[in-house]
Structure formats: structure tokens, C-alpha cells
Amino acid sequence: MKASLEGFTLIELMIVILIIGIMSAVAVPRFEKRIELEELRFEKKFTYQIWEELELYAKQQKELTGMESWPTNPLSVLGRMRNVIVTYSLGIPDKDNEWRFDGTKLYHRRMNNEVWYFEYNSDNFYLSELPTKL
């Protein structure tokens, strides 16, 4: 009797690996783009929350002093935040998902270690809506 050999041939394994490689080549860039879009969505939502708090601050200042004003540091209007690192020291963030302010720019370090920033000017009541890559 002849022994039965079961299993995959080398050609079959190579074809499966090739198919997985092609699928990965298509899926990975899409996945990275999706992550980038989610980071942008989060940043816009976060800065919108800051904007709302700045407007509330300006309203309170008008009631107290008779003049609207925004704080020098936009991060100072935030309360407690989950999953966000807010650092009040100056400079560029060095941790993932950290936010810092340097006097004119509100910096955010994304999960892929890219640093993006939003322009801020308390004198002109200005906070940019879209980030710029550093």
C-alpha cells in the first residue's frame, strides 16, 4: 500500500501568501487614511469644544468687566477631559494625543507622531477651524 500524503503543496502556499499580500497592499493604506480622518474629526470636535468654552468665557467677562475677552491660553477654559492629555507647559507636545499651547499656536501630537497645530489669537477672537501640519 502506498502512504497517503496530505497537506498543501508549495505552490498552493505561495498562491495563498500572494493573495494575502495583495489584500494587505489594498487594505493598509485605506486603514491608515481612516485613522487620519478620525484624528482630524477628533481635533475638529475638540477645538469646537474649546471654541464654545471660549465664547462662554467671553460672555462671563462681559458681565464682569463690561468687555468681552478671551483668555491668553485657550486650554485654560477646559474642564476635565477623558483620553486627552492637556499640558500647560509651553512647546511642542511629546506624547501621543497631547495638546499644548505656545502663545500663538495650539499643538496636537497625533497617534502617528505627527504634530498639527491650530492658530489662536485672543486679541482678535480667532481660533482656526482646520489644523496645519508642523
PLM segments and residue spans:
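Membrane-proximal N-terminal amphipathic helix
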Residues: 36-63
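N-terminal single-pass transmembrane signal-anchor helix
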Residues: 2-31
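Helix-centric, low-specificity signal for extended rod-like, repetitive segments
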Residues: 11, 27, 37-38, 73
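Extracellular/periplasmic head regions of type IV pilus-like filament subunits
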Residues: 59-122, 130-134
